[in-house]
Amino acid sequence: IEEFMLLANQCAAHFARVKQIPFVYRVHEEPNAEKLERLHGLLQACGVNDHFAKDVPTPKELSAILEGVRGTPFEQIVNTGMLRCMSKACYEEKPKGHYGLVLKDYAHFTSPIRRYPDLAIHRMMTDLLSGTDKETMIVRYTDFAEKASKQSSEREVLAVQIERKAEDYYKAEYARRHLGECYEGIISGVTQRGIFVELENGVEGFVPASSLTATGTTLTEGIRLSDPASGKTWSLGDSMMITIVRADINLGKVDFEVAPETK
């Protein structure tokens, strides 16, 4: 069923491009150089080989990396890092192809849950198939396709933001019920201010650099925090024991400290 749906989406977009009529395309451009450089640093920190045939990796090459880390402690971190590396898919009135699906033509013509772009496309294609000529289609739907694309992209971004906030609230609510408990987690993010640690259950919390050492830390390319005085390091992908010390449900934020027995 999924293959039929993908094919229907592809055929609808191809039909519109060939007919040169206004349309709402689903566009996914390739990742830019800056994001790829960050991904490279992450993969190197996790000990993953990322030598690609060209400057921009193919989706097949990225899938091979994900398969290679499946079942390892780095699986979730690499998966998240790769998602953050990707360009945001959006709706546009001009066909630019879909990097992730490796397709020249793609649109959201059908889906398990009906979306507005689907309905916008149905409206335009129905008009064309009912006998409306190309010139009339251009006059009637050029502005409509542009506005529908822009609004659909904006609403999608907002929906994702709300979804993530809701998840953060529930994770903080869960963490609040387990204050003082110790867990093993994986370092999922490194900043000058401290490190982010993700637990196996998906809860992510922040460990301030000030709680790691009193002598100051040095950040290395966003992948490693080190204490020059003691020689200790905290790198992406490292495991560590933490204690849940704070959980703010309203902000959806959780704070950790290094577990006493591991300081």
PLM feature segments, named:
Residues 199, 236-263:
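OB-fold/S1-family single-stranded nucleic acid-binding modules
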Residues 1-200, 206-213, 217-219, 246, ...:
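Append "with occasional cross-activation on large, charged helical scaffolds in nucleic-acid assemblies
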Residues 176-182, 216-242:
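Short nucleic-acid-contacting surface segments enriched for D/E, G, S/T with interspersed K/R
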Residues 139, 223-225, 250:
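Hydrophobic transmembrane signal anchors and adjacent membrane-proximal interface regions, especially
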